[in-house]
């Protein structure tokens, strides 16, 4: 996150309005909610985890036990249960 001087990007009228509420402080202006991305969307991590979870569900349906899956994927038994019993 880079700091930018308000005078460089905001109109003077808006700066005066903001100064009614705060002066000499750093203000963070977040992105609009509509432009937020879900966790892992940019890096591809979300897809990797979704693919892994699909493989775990498939293996469970094909007869592997929760303990076997826990050992194979190096996840806790509780995590495997959450994956296989989720919708």
From Swiss-Prot:
Entry-linked InterPro entries: c-mor_Regulatory_Protein, Homeodomain-like_sf, YraL-like
What residue ranges are annotated as transmembrane? none
Q: Which domain of life is it from?
A: Bacteria
> Got any disulfides in this one, which pairs?
none
Q: What is this protein called?
A: Uncharacterized protein YraL
**Species per Swiss-Prot/TrEMBL record:** Bacillus subtilis (strain 168)
Encoding gene (name): yraL
